Amino acid sequence: MSNHMSIMKFLNQILCLSLILSISMTTLSFAQTCSKYKFSSNNVFDSCNDLPFLDSFLHYTYESSTGSLHIAYRHTKLTSGKWVAWAVNPTSTGMVGAQAIVAYPQSDGTVRVYTSPIRSYQTSLLEGDLSFNVSGLSATYQNNEIVVLASLKLAQDLGNGGTINTVWQDGSMSGNSLLPHPTSGNNVRSVSTLNLVSGVSAAAGGAGGSSKLRKRNIHGILNGVSWGIMMPLGAIIARYLRVAKSADPAWFYIHVFCQASAYIIGVAGWATGLKLGGDSPGIQYSTHRAIGIALFSLATVQVFAMFLRPKPEHKHRLYWNIYHHTIGYTIIILGVVNVFKGLGILSPKKQWKNAYIGIIVVLAIVATLLEAFTWYVVIKRRKLEAKTAQHGASNGTRSQYA
C-alpha cells in the first residue's frame, strides 16, 4: 500500500507541475511611442498607431469628405538587405487582395518605392497599379529605418464606419530580388483593422475578419496537450502504476482513459491542421505535416490493435506487447518532436516554449525516479517471494491487464 501511495504522489506532482508550468504566462504590453516621433521633413499627421508586430508605426491624416488618406509608414530596426511593405486590403483581411506599397534600399543609397497589387500567395511583389489612386509616393532610409510617405484616394464612403483592413510586412533580399517573407511568427500576425475616424486599431482576428491565427493557436494547443503531454503521461501511468498490486486493474483503465482522451484531442488537432493547410495553399510545412500524418496513422493503428489484444497466457501475447510498446514509444517521441516543430512555426512568446520544455523535463525526471523506484520494489518483492515461496515456484501473481 505504501508503494502505491508513493507512486500516486509522484503522479499527482506531475499533474500539478504540468498545470503550473502551462499557465505561467506573462502579458507583453506595447509602449506608445509614435506620438513622440518628429519627422525630419516636418510632416505632421493627425493620428498615429504603434503597430503590434515587426517594429512598425503608422502615422496618418484622413479626410473623410474626400476619402483622402495621407500616410507615413515607418519600419524600424531593419538589418541590411531587407524590403518592407504596407498595404490596404479593400476586400478582406490578410494578404490576398491587398494593395501594397513596397520599399527597399538600393546599393546606390537611394530607396526604391512602388505599388504592387497582391493577387495570390505566390506573389513576387511586382510593380503594378492599385485599385485606388496613389500620389506623393516617396521613401527614405536612415538609421536602420524606412519611412514611406504616400497619399491614397479611398472611397468617400468606406461602407463600414471608416474601417480599413491593413497589412504590413518585411522580408529579405537577394541582390535586387525580393525573397518571400517568413511564414511564421510575427510575419503572419501583422494584419489589423483600423478605424480612420476613431483611430482604434485591432487585430484582424479579434475584429472578426480573419480567424487563421486563432485556428493556428487552437491547433497548437490541442496537439501540444494531446501528443506532447497526455501521451507521455499515459505511458508513465502504465509503466509505473502497475507495480503497486493494489492498483491492479485500476492502472489499466486509467492508462486507457488517458491515451484515448489524448487520441480524441489529437485527432481534433490533426483535423484543424488539415483545415489550415487547405486554407493556405501557398504555405507548406512539409516535415511538420508528414510527422502529423504519421502520428495520426500510428495512433489509429494502436487504438484498433487494442481489440486484437491476446489474453496474457496466449502464446502470441509477447509479440503483441513488443508491437504495442514499440509503436507507443514511437508515437511519444514523434509527438514531442512535432510539438517543438509547431512551436518553431508559430513562434509564440518565449514563455510558451519554456513552459513546454519545463513540462517535458519534469516528466523525464519523474519517469527516471519512478524507473529506479520500480526496479527497487520489483527486486525487493522477488527476494521476499523467493524466501517465502514453497518449492521456489511462486514468482507473484501476474495482472491479466499487463
Curated annotation (Swiss-Prot):
Organism per entry: Arabidopsis thaliana
Cellular compartments annotated: Membrane
**UniProt entry tagged with the keyword Cell membrane:** no
Looking at the record, the residues that make up the Cytochrome b561 domain are 183-379
**What is this protein called in UniProt?**
Cytochrome b561 and DOMON domain-containing protein At4g17280
What SMART domains does the entry give? B561
What's one GO MF term for it?
A: metal ion binding
Role played: May act as a catecholamine-responsive trans-membrane electron transporter.
Q: Binding residues for heme b 1, per the UniProt record?
A: 219, 288
An example of a Gene Ontology cellular component annotation for this protein is:
membrane
- Cross-referenced Pfam families: Cytochrom_B561, DUF568
Topology relative to the lipid bilayer, per the entry, is: Multi-pass membrane protein
Cystine residue pairs: none
What does the entry's domain section say?
Answer: DOMON domain could bind catecholamines and thereby could regulate the cytochrome b561 domain function. DOMON domain could bind one heme b.
Q: Which cofactor does it need?
A: heme b
State how the cofactor is bound.
Answer: Binds 2 heme b groups non-covalently.
The protein's matches in InterPro entries, at most eight in alphabetical order, are given as: AIR12_DOMON (IPR045265), Cyt_b561/ferric_Rdtase_TM (IPR006593), DOMON_domain (IPR005018), UCP037471 (IPR017214)
The entry's heme b 2-binding residues are 255, 324
Q: Where is the DOMON domain?
A: 54-171
